């Protein structure tokens, strides 16, 4: 049985209020899937207010014009586990170093990793704009 957590419910109420009152003014501008508010609700429901708050803040900080966006499930959820199983190249352990493109490790030169480099344009791509080209007009 789940216990009543008043701070968590207060935070959930805040996010739902944001979605109802503020979010419609901006339209669909989130670069991530699920949207930042959906991510926040899911994090609060799964982890509670104390563990979810840093996750939500970090997610909001990442949602900026210089970010590529993409699928970003809440850590510790079945969706995140399934994503890691289907896409092991996106998971990083705490001890794994950041990829150094100056060494000759062939794993660093895989197409999926090259595309994650800011400013990288695939030679076969017709896109010449900024990474936020899929956001639409602001």
From Swiss-Prot:
HAMAP family: UPF0161_YidD. Pfam families: YidD. Residues 123-138 have a biased composition (Polar residues). This is Putative membrane protein insertion efficiency factor. Could be involved in insertion of integral membrane proteins into the membrane. Belongs to the UPF0161 family. It comes from the Bacteria. Residues 71-138 are annotated as: Disordered. InterPro entries: Membr_insert_effic_factor_YidD (IPR002696). Residues 81-113 have a biased composition (Basic and acidic residues). It is a peripheral membrane protein. Keywords: Cell membrane, Membrane. One of its GO terms (cellular component) is plasma membrane. It is found in: Cell membrane.
């Amino acid at each position: 049985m789940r216990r009543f957590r008043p701070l968590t419910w207060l935070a959930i109420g805040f996010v739902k209020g944001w979605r109802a009152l503020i979010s419609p003014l901006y339209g669909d501008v989130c670069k991530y899937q699920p949207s930042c508010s959906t991510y926040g609700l899911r994090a609060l429901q799964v982890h509670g207010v104390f563990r979810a708050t840093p996750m939500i803040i970090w997610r909001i900080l990442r949602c900026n014009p210089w970010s590529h966006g993409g699928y970003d499930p809440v850590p510790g959820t079945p969706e995140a586990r399934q994503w890691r199983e289907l896409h092991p190249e996106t998971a990083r352990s705490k001890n794994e170093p950041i990829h150094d493109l100056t060494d000759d490790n062939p794993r660093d030169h895989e197409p999926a990793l090259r595309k994650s480099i800011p400013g990288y344009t695939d030679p076969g791509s017709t896109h010449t704009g900024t990474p936020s080209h899929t956001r639409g007009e602001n």
